[in-house]
Amino acid sequence: MREFYRRHRGLHRWLLAVAALLAVYFALRPVPGLMNWLSRHVIMPWERAVASVCYLFRTSIAEVSYIVLLSVAIFYVANVLRRMVTQPHRGRTLYRFFLTVVCSGLSIYAGFCLLWGVNYYADSFQQQSGIYARSCTVEELEAVTADFAHQLAQAADNVQRDENGCFAVSRQEIFAAATSVYAPSYEEFPCLRMKDHTPKAISCSTALSAMDFTGFYFPFTGEANLNVDCPASFLPSTIVHEMAHQRGIASEQECNFIAIAVSLASGDPVYRYSGLLMGYVHLGNALYRADPARWQAIRDTLPDTVVADLRQNSAYWAAFQGPVNDAASKVYDSFLKSNGESRGVQSYGTVVDMLMAYYG
C-alpha cells in the first residue's frame, strides 16, 4: 500500500490538498462576516486587478482559456489511449488518468468556489440596497406588467429597426455605450460603483447558444463575456446583467433585477428599451402563469415592433432545444444549488418579486 501511494504521491497529495481546501471553504462559508471581508477586500479587488490586465486585449481571455483547456484535455486523453494500447501496466495508467481527471475537476471547482462562490455568502444586493423581494397579488402584478408594456410600446419607436420591424441597432454601438450605463444609478445604488471596461464578445457564440447561455462572467479573468449570435434586442440588458456580476453580485435573480433597473435609469434609449423588454418578459411570464386572460389582454396592447422582437428571440432559442442544451442547463442548475440558490435556474423567476418591490 505504501509503495502504491509513493508511486502516485504527487496526485494523491494534490487530491488531499484540494479536498482540504474545499473542506475549509464549506466549513467557513456560513460565516457572513468572513465572507463579506473576503469578497470586498480580497477576492473582488484581485479579480478587478486581473481584469484590468485582461481588458488590454480585445479577445476574451476567458474564451482563449476554455479553448486551451479543451485542447489540453483532448491531447491528454489521446495520449492516455495511446499508452493503454502500446505500453504495459494498463491498470496503473488508467488509475493515473482517473485520478488526474478527478484532481483537475476538483481544482477547477475549488477555484470557482473561492473566486466566485464566496460572493453567494456575502451580503446580497437586497441587503446592500434595501430592496427586498416581496410577494404580490395578481392585481398588483397585472398593474406593473401593464405599466412595463406601456413604456415598452413607447420606447420601441426610439430604436433603429430593419425592414421587418425588428431591432437593428448594431452590436458595436451597444458595446461602445456599455461603460457609461451604470453611472446614473450610482447615487441610488452606491454599492454598484466601480470602473467599467467594455465587455468582451465571444467568437464561439453559437456554442454558447447551444448551451443556452446569453453570456457569462469568468471569475478567473474578471471579464464579462457576451453571446453575440443571438438577437441583439436583449444584448444591452444582458450586458448590464454580466457587469453586475463584476460588482460581486452572485445571485442571478438580483443581477436580472439590476439589469432592468440600471437599463431603465441609464438615459440611453437602446438600453432602456432592452431593459423594458427583459422586465416585460419576466413579469409577463409570471402573469401568464397566474392568469392567462389578464396576460393576453396586456399582450394585445403591444405594437407590432415589440411583438416582432419577441418572436425573433423565441424562434432563435427554439432552434437550440436539445440534449446539449438540457445537459448544460442541468450542470449550471447543480452549480447554482451547490452555492445556495435552492431553486437553481428557476431562481431567475424570483426577479419578479424584486421588480414588484421596486416598481409596484
Task: Report residues per predicted region.
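Alpha-helical transmembrane segments and their helix-start/interface "positive-inside/aromatic belt" motifs
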Residues: 4-18, 96-101
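Membrane-embedded alpha-helical segments of integral membrane proteins
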Residues: 19-82
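Active-site recognition of the HExxH zinc-binding catalytic motif
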Residues: 58, 235-256, 260-261
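Transmembrane alpha-helices and immediately adjacent membrane-cytoplasm interface residues
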Residues: 73-78, 91-126
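Membrane-interface segments at or immediately adjacent to transmembrane helices
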Residues: 117-185
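Post-HExxH zinc-binding segment in Zn-dependent metallohydrolases
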Residues: 139-143, 148, 250-295
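Auxiliary, metal-adjacent structural segments of Zn-dependent hydrolase domains
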Residues: 160-228, 232
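Pan-zinc metallopeptidase signature
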Residues: 305-360
